[in-house]
Amino acid sequence: MGQVLPLVTRQGDRIAIVSGLRTPFARQATAFHGIPAVDLGKMVVGELLARSEIPAEVIEQLVFGQVVQMPEAPNIAREIVLGTGMNVHTDAYSVSRACATSFQAVANVAESLMAGTIRAGIAGGADSSSVLPIGVSKKLAHVLVDVNKARTMSQRLKLFSRLRLRDLMPVPPAVAEYSTGLRMGDTAEQMAKTYGITREQQDALAHRSHQRAAQAWSDGKLKEEVMTAFIPPYKQPLVEDNNIRGNSSLADYAKLRPAFDRKHGTVTAANSTPLTDGAAAVILMTESRAKELGLVPLGYLRSYAFTAIDVWQDMLLGPARSTPLALERAGLTMSELTLIDMHEAFAAQTLANIQLLGSERFAREVLGRAHATGEVDDSKFNVLGGSIAYGHPFAATGARMITQTLHELRRRGGGFGLVTACAAGGLGAAMVLEAE
């Protein structure tokens, strides 16, 4: 057993999460079509502050993330401060850790709280898959820079004459890993084959995710943590996530063709999370600051861990690697958890991580640990559904998971919850939460 690392300030204060909120999540090019991530971020932070009734000047720092960067607003955090009526002196900076971006934002605010430089801050993330930075070819970009330096019209025309029609075609954002050229779906296929995960198992998990998410909405469990979004042309508000298939059957999933390995694959659009637009944020404070303001925290951040592995194989095993570290730092075991919430990038990736968390061989030979992290109890796992159903606005997912888990822990009378995710680049994140 490694060292327990209590997340407390010098005065012994725990890190309290006092409030959390998100927009409804919308599939790419649907309800939030044309709404940039920065506007989604402003929307959720503005509403979060209004609902919490916390004076804006109490917030001393805002750390926010965006994975699909927009060149015109590179520091989304600062734009949110300036666009929501927050105190202009509020420190604000942006982070990016792929699909674990808002985990990183929460960790950064927590570290500021523990260092004593602030007493309250906001962490979160927003992404739009509908408003994308469409680029130009490398040759056109090179010519445009040279044209800007040219002094005469003849020099400019000569430069433009080097271009061909294909050089003028727009270039969409890459969906593959920069370092390997592999898509995340390719890695999900590799993991399905390596760990013997069948198409039927993947479809069953996806179906479970949609059923549970639909039930969560039907039972009213998400109303407190999801705002109503009013979007141009303001004819109809978006109230709920629009990706959830509440009436689907397992037979529906079986009809889809593989999306990555067309001949022999098992990963489909239905057993993967879709491209999504949305934003989410949480307010963190020292425990004493929350008491001063008369606030009852949703819960507390008990521990966190980030890991990184090679990107050529098993790139999406972040949960299997970061979870034992987070549990160790929290001084807990898997059996002591009340809830486990794992990001469902793909059903194949999710099932592989579940398998390896319970594997003694993986623990010994890969992690160098004496025993497996622990079997995942299905009754504790993704009890309200997961990212396959809700969708995945990259930078917002972590904050969604944290808020959702804390609310569910409180409904169950308290306890400990694990939230964990894989991320592009072979990254992994895990956090242990506590509610009373």
Swiss-Prot record:
Extent of the signal sequence: none
Pathway(s) of this molecule: Lipid metabolism; fatty acid beta-oxidation
GO cellular component: cytosol
InterPro entries to which the protein is assigned, alphabetical: Ac-CoA_C-AcTrfase_FadI (IPR012806), Thiolase (IPR002155), Thiolase-like (IPR016039), Thiolase_acyl_enz_int_AS (IPR020615), Thiolase_AS (IPR020610), Thiolase_C (IPR020617), Thiolase_CS (IPR020613), Thiolase_N (IPR020616)
Chief place where the protein resides: cytoplasm
UniProt record, GO biological process: fatty acid beta-oxidation
Keyword Ligase: no
A Pfam cross-reference name: Thiolase_C
Active site positions, chain numbering: C99 (acyl-thioester intermediate), H392 (proton acceptor), C422 (proton acceptor)
GO molecular function per UniProt: acetyl-CoA C-acyltransferase activity
Assigned keywords, A-Z: Acyltransferase, Cytoplasm, Fatty acid metabolism, Lipid degradation, Lipid metabolism, Transferase
Catalytic reaction annotation: an acyl-CoA + acetyl-CoA = a 3-oxoacyl-CoA + CoA
Disulfide bonds: none
Entry annotated with the keyword Cytoplasm: yes
Annotated EC: 2.3.1.16
Location in the cell: Cytoplasm
Subunit structure, as described in the record: Heterotetramer of two alpha chains (FadJ) and two beta chains (FadI).
NCBIfam families linked to this entry: AcCoA-C-Actrans (TIGR01930), FadI (TIGR02446), PRK08963.1 (NF006516)
Protein family membership: Belongs to the thiolase-like superfamily. Thiolase family.
Function: Catalyzes the final step of fatty acid oxidation in which acetyl-CoA is released and the CoA ester of a fatty acid two carbons shorter is formed.
Record-given protein name: 3-ketoacyl-CoA thiolase
Organism phylogeny: Bacteria, Pseudomonadati, Pseudomonadota, Gammaproteobacteria, Enterobacterales
Gene it is expressed from: fadI
